[in-house]
């Protein structure tokens, strides 16, 4: 086990246009092969699509989508007596937000559509309306935690 302390959590930097940390977190998850400018253009196009289709502030729609996708509990595998139990554990807000962003992006990648910007915008809109695959993933996680509630004392 490491003798060093845990690393300090660095705050996420805000993005250059909207000055928002959540937007920058999304961009950092979109980046592939170091192409951050492409990730920014994908997200900003998606935000433009959100503005056109919902007539609302895209930042508030993204916040709502992430908030509605954020899980409260998850299951962790714990070995006990030769068998593995799925133990429900509460999730901290930062970890929940990271999971929500990951689920939204994965659901957007799996969609079939024209461009990543279009797929991302439609997934964000669906998540804000509490539909879509990211919300389904959250519900599935909560169902798993509820089903394995009997093992909550194994923490």
UniProtKB/Swiss-Prot annotation:
One of its GO terms (molecular function) is rRNA binding. GO terms for cellular component: chloroplast; small ribosomal subunit. One of its GO terms (biological process) is translation. Its main location: plastid. Keywords: Chloroplast, Plastid, Ribonucleoprotein, Ribosomal protein, RNA-binding, rRNA-binding. It is found in: Plastid, Chloroplast. Pfam families: Ribosomal_S7 (PF00177). Signal peptide: none annotated. Part of the 30S ribosomal subunit. One of the primary rRNA binding proteins, it binds directly to 16S rRNA where it nucleates assembly of the head domain of the 30S subunit. Belongs to the universal ribosomal protein uS7 family. This is Small ribosomal subunit protein uS7c. It comes from Zygnema circumcarinatum (Green alga). The gene is rps7.
């Amino acid at each position: 086990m490491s003798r060093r302390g845990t690393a300090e959590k660095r705050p996420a930097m805000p993005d250059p246009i909207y000055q928002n940390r959540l937007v920058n977190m999304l961009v950092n998850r979109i980046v592939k092969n170091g192409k951050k400018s492409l990730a920014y253009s994908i997200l900003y196009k998606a935000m433009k699509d959100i503005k056109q289709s919902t007539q609302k502030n895209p930042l508030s729609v993204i916040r709502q989508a992430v908030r509605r996708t954020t899980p409260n509990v998850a299951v962790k595998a714990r070995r006990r007596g030769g068998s593995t139990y799925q133990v429900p554990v509460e999730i901290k807000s930062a970890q929940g937000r990271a999971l929500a962003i990951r689920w939204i992006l994965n659901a957007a990648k799996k969609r079939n559509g024209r461009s990543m910007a279009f797929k991302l915008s439609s997934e964000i809109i669906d998540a804000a309306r509490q539909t879509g695959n990211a919300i389904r993933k959250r519900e599935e996680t909560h169902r798993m935690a509820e089903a394995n509630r009997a093992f909550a004392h194994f923490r």
